[in-house]
Amino acid sequence: METDTLLLWVLLLWVPGSTGDIVLTQSPASLAVSLGQRATISCRASKSVNTYGNSFMZWYZZKPGZPPKLLIYRASNLZSGIPARFSGSGSRTBFTLTIBPVZABDVATYFCZZSBZBPWTFGSGTKLEIKR
């Protein structure tokens, strides 16, 4: 999937916490992690987002005043230019975004998104902060 096409769809359909046929439950809502430690964010779909052997789950990072940035596509594939500190895993209904180690620049809100069925839907977001 080309990044430009995906970004256009995301910008057109960006409705955090929206609901459709598939509901995404993201947790935790907020997370404070020390620099250098691991952050783990979970996303559970109300039904499987697997089709033809692919898991249609994406992860985005959003910072104030910036468009969402694609980190992970199809559950575990790292988008070009994204550091290997970011990784995705999971299948069917249960997915995880891991950031290890966390850096100061990772302060943001992270969203899961399913692209298996129209309308594409998003989780409600996880706000990552640095523990002082």
From Swiss-Prot:
Residues 113-121 are annotated as: Complementarity-determining-3. Residues 81-112 are annotated as: Framework-3. Residues 44-58 are annotated as: Complementarity-determining-1. Residues 74-80 are annotated as: Complementarity-determining-2. InterPro entries: Ig-like_dom, Ig-like_dom_sf, Ig-like_fold, Ig_sub, Ig_V-set, IgV_Light_Chain. Keywords: Adaptive immunity, Bence-Jones protein, Disulfide bond, Immunity, Immunoglobulin, Signal. Residues 122-131 are annotated as: Framework-4. SMART domains: IG, IGv. One of its GO terms (cellular component) is immunoglobulin complex. GO terms for biological process: adaptive immune response; immune response. It holds the Pfam family V-set. Residues 59-73 are annotated as: Framework-2. Disulfide bonds join C43-C112. The keyword Signal applies. The partial sequence of the C region of this Bence-Jones protein was also determined. It differs from that reported for mouse MOPC 21 only in the transposition of two nearby residues. This is Ig kappa chain V-III region MOPC 321. It comes from Mus musculus.
